[in-house]
Structure formats: structure tokens, C-alpha cells
């Protein structure tokens, strides 16, 4: 909440879809830490983790921004972060990678890592 005008700040309660073209504005310039889900539609484990990512976005709204990037459609950003396997979750702050989670992990593990960065 803005201390001046009392409006919510980036109260995203759902993941935002980002592309190579929107990455700078949506992720790098975010005032909040960002959980970036790098995924592809054909990836079974990516589909398994998708509901967890939705829950994390809802629970951490206002403290963390959650974004999803399809690696097949956005190869530039995937290459920039040297993504070798998916799902890969990156926790970014100021556009810099702070943590990397590869593969399906329990929600509690993801939240714990986010809380450390967002504190």
C-alpha cells in the first residue's frame, strides 16, 4: 500500500505472463522481488507445478510478483539465464538472480526461499 495515496502497489494475485519484449518492464523494473517460472506447455512437470505457482502468487501478493515465461516462445530470456531444464524457477531482485530452483519442489520450499529474499 502506498504510504502517500493508500493505493495497492502491484497487488498481483495471479502470475503475469511475460515475454522477451516485456521482461525489462515487468521483471527487471519491478520494485518487488519476482518469482519467474520458466516453463513450456509440453512439459509435464511444468504442468504439475503450475497450481503451486498460482497459490504462491495469491498468498504472497503485494510482497512478491510472480511471472511466467514460456521458454519455447521466448528463447532470448531463457538463454540469458542459461536455462537447461524446466521447470526452472528464478527468484530475482532488481533483475538479478538471487535463487534458482530446478524441477518440481514443494510449495513450502518455494515460499521459504521467497520469504528470505522478500524480508
Give, region by region, the residue ranges found by the protein language model.
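Proteins that catalyze or organize thiol-disulfide redox chemistry
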Residues: 1-35, 40-65, 73-119
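Conserved residues in the N-terminal Rossmann fold of short-chain dehydrogenase/reductase
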Residues: 68
Amino acid at each position: 500500500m502506498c504510504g502517500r495515496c493508500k493505493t495497492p502497489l502491484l497487488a498481483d494475485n495471479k502470475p503475469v505472463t511475460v515475454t522477451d519484449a516485456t521482461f525489462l518492464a515487468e521483471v527487471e523494473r519491478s520494485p518487488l522481488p519476482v518469482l519467474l517460472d520458466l516453463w513450456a506447455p509440453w512439459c509435464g512437470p511444468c504442468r504439475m507445478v503450475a497450481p503451486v505457482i498460482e497459490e504462491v502468487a495469491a498468498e504472497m501478493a503485494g510482497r512478491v510478483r510472480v511471472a511466467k515465461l514460456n521458454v519455447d516462445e521466448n528463447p532470448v530470456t531463457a538463454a540469458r539465464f542459461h536455462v537447461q531444464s524446466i521447470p526452472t524457477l528464478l527468484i530475482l531482485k532488481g533483475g538479478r538472480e538471487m535463487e534458482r530452483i530446478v524441477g518440481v519442489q514443494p510449495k513450502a520450499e518455494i515460499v521459504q526461499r521467497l520469504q528470505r529474499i522478500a524480508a
